[in-house]
């Protein structure tokens, strides 16, 4: 049996401000730093250790991983960063407040933009300063690989090749792996691992800073999964994620 730990980054400054973030490179909030520390502490308490770590090229995930590895005294292990683990690209919504957007377009539309597997938010244009092609960290990507917007399927289509080519072989080689990434890149991976339908994935909310453990068989098919959190805390944090896209009076 293999184990892999999935961890959504701690609360970011834009999570705190309830903004669509996507590929915008915002840092952790003070609460997010504390969430990452707590994640590291609970992993240590439960006896977890790691031989390799994977994360995105966005600092909220990278810093979460650093903090966790620091708590575990594992800052020396190899860390592999890939744009393929980035958050889903939210197109022209990036930077907008989710509740204000829900007020303007309706909660149902915003839920589709946030949670649907197939609906894409309005796209960026290439002359928009937010276009990732202007960012040196994506200099090696072809123009086709740089998104102007993404739905969850698009996100899955970049996450899963990286899982299959790089992460899965690392796990199969016997290395203990942690993946620190984002709400939607992890939802995409969970959809793939658990073979969830497009309808089922709409209702899945992954909270910030709570380790999610997958136990996998020899073919890396899930045996079971569980969060390292008590039921009450988990439900509260999942509900907070679900509420983000609702209009406020």
From Swiss-Prot:
A Pfam family found in this protein is His_Phos_1
**Which family does the UniProt entry place this protein in?**
Belongs to the phosphoglycerate mutase family. BPG-dependent PGAM subfamily.
Report the source organism. Caldanaerobacter subterraneus subsp. tengcongensis (strain DSM 15242 / JCM 11007 / NBRC 100824 / MB4)
Q: What is this protein called?
A: 2,3-bisphosphoglycerate-dependent phosphoglycerate mutase
Keywords from UniProt, A to Z, are: Gluconeogenesis, Glycolysis, Isomerase
Q: In which pathway does it act?
A: Carbohydrate degradation; glycolysis; pyruvate from D-glyceraldehyde 3-phosphate: step 3/5
CDD domains tied to this protein: HP_PGM_like
Q: Is Isomerase set as a keyword in this record?
A: yes
The protein's site described by Transition state stabilizer is found at 182
Instruction: Quote the NCBIfam families the UniProt record gives.
Output: pgm_1, PRK14115.1
Q: Does the keyword Isomerase apply?
A: yes
**Which top class of enzyme applies to this chain?**
isomerase
Lineage top rank: taxon: Bacteria
Q: Which GO terms describe its biological process?
A: gluconeogenesis; glycolytic process
Identify the residues that bind substrate: 8-15, 21-22, 60, 87-90, 98, 114-115, 183-184
> What GO MF terms are annotated?
phosphoglycerate mutase activity
The active site annotation covers 9 (tele-phosphohistidine intermediate), 87 (proton donor/acceptor)
């Amino acid at each position: 049996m293999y184990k892999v730990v999935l961890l959504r980054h701690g609360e970011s400054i834009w999570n705190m401000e309830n903004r669509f973030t996507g590929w915008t490179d915002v840092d952790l909030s003070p609460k997010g730093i504390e969430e990452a520390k707590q994640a590291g502490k609970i992993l240590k308490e439960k006896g977890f250790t790691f031989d390799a770590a994977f994360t995105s090229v966005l600092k909220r995930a990278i810093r979460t991983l650093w903090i966790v590895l620091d708590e575990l005294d594992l800052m020396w292990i190899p860390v592999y960063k890939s744009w393929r683990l980035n958050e889903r690209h939210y197109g022209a919504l990036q930077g907008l407040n989710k509740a204000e957007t829900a007020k303007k377009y309706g909660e149902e539309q915003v839920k589709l933009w946030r949670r649907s597997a197939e609906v894409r938010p309005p796209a960026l244009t290439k002359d928009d300063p937010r276009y990732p092609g202007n960012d040196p960290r994506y200099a090696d990507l072809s123009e086709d690989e740089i998104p102007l917007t993404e739905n969850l399927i698009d996100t899955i289509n970049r996450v899963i090749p990286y899982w299959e080519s790089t992460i899965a072989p690392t796990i199969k080689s016997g290395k203990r792996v942690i993946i620190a990434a984002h709400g939607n890149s992890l939802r995409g991976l969970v959809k793939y691992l658990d073979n969830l339908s497009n309808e089922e994935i709409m209702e899945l909310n992954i909270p910030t800073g709570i380790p999610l453990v997958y136990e996998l068989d020899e073919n890396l098919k899930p045996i079971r999964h569980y969060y390292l959190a008590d039921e009450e805390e988990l439900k509260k944090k999942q509900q907070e994620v679900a509420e983000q896209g609702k209009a406020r009076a």
